[in-house]
Amino acid sequence: MLFRSQCVQKDDMQEIYKKMLEAKVIVFASPVYFYTFNASMKLLIDRTFAIEKTIHDKYFYLLTTGLAPEESYFRIIKDTFQKYIDCLRVGGNRFVDSILGFQTGNKDDIEKTDSIEKAYNIAKEIKINE
């Protein structure tokens, strides 16, 4: 597959580009580290620069968890994600929704939030709109 912008690195990212271009819905999931994405997710975001002009009409969702005690601690990661989508907006892409699992420092903490129910409802909505 030919991209308008070619990534100079020839690695497994080519397959990720292909999957992103074929998808209608793209979900980014990352724990919050120091108010923003972990390094792996930031690397993925940076690497998608190679397809920014060819990725069109996608619906983006953000799923994130963190030990932070309240939603305000997630403002930076949400703003960063919105700015990322803004860079891609030229192609009709949009940031649809986010699920923020705050106070989730332990594996079972997520079950004490409404995050699982919200994720389920979003997945149902996506399925209905396919």
Residue locations for each model-derived region?
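Glycine-rich phosphate/pyrophosphate-binding loop and the adjoining helix
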Residues: Q82-E130
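Helix-loop-strand module that forms the ligand-binding subsite of alpha/beta enzymes
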Residues: V8-R89
